[in-house]
Amino acid sequence: MDVKNKMVAESMSFYYDDYQALKNISIAFPENQVTALIGPSGCGKSTFLRCLNRMNDLVPKTRMSGRIMLGDLNIYNPKIDVVDLRKKIGMVFQKPNPFPKSIYDNIAYAPRIHGLVRTRQETDALVEDSLHKAGLWNEVKDRLNDLGTALSGGQQQRLCIARAIAMQPDVLLMDEPASALDPIATQKIEDLVLELKKRFTIIIVTHNMQQASRASDYTAFFYLGELIEFGKTDQIFTKPREKQTEDYITGRFG
């Protein structure tokens, strides 16, 4: 079966002032698959993830070379509208960050602003659909007017996922989305990731090796700003080609 790539980084380097945080990264992310980015703290994986929707544009004295393509679109083309780009590439952060609004408005706010919904009926349908996809609807359907911040940590994170997918992105980026959650909530997030890949291409940063092996199709190992190895998750975890990869996933360093 031919693999279609949704997003591709080509010879990408990234600098904080004079410090080179990422060194000549080339990687392709298959469509409707989950790719896990692993590596020790400070290896560049979260910096790389933020490059994929230009979040690092907000950081002073940074620069990037190379290309990142979303389909035929070079996302660093100066003519690109970054707000429009981030509609195509959603982001879920490590710490749940619901808006201080109702559960309903957490989902409806951005689609209203961007004109994705025009009537109350359309908005209701989008809110319900997004909460269903995030596995949260049955838990909150009778209290949509409650504050999103009143939910449990795991529910807040699924609300943030629902908020991201309400914008109907092509790609969903997740930066350690379960690291602040208990094991039960973590399992729900992992199950959700496997369900969501039917509709979205997912790129997830994780420090949890078991999570990477359970919830991803492909794995990329970063070390000191370099992409050391990339391949199917089964191969990376059972027969890694590089000794550094093997040492990391077996706990010898990192």
From Swiss-Prot:
Classification via PANTHER family: ABC TRANSPORTER I FAMILY MEMBER 17 (PTHR43423:SF1)
Protein name, as recorded: Phosphate import ATP-binding protein PstB
Domain ABC transporter: 7-249
Alphabetized Pfam families for the sequence: ABC_tran (PF00005)
Taxonomic source organism: Chlorobium chlorochromatii (strain CaD3)
Annotated compartments: Cell inner membrane
Binding residues annotated for ATP, in chain numbering: G39, P40, S41, G42, C43, G44, K45, S46
Subunit structure: The complex is composed of two ATP-binding proteins (PstB), two transmembrane proteins (PstC and PstA) and a solute-binding protein (PstS).
EC number: 7.3.2.1
Membrane topology value: Peripheral membrane protein
Alphabetical list of PROSITE patterns matching this protein: ABC_TRANSPORTER_1, ABC_TRANSPORTER_2, PSTB
Family the UniProt entry places it in: Belongs to the ABC transporter superfamily. Phosphate importer (TC 3.A.1.7) family.
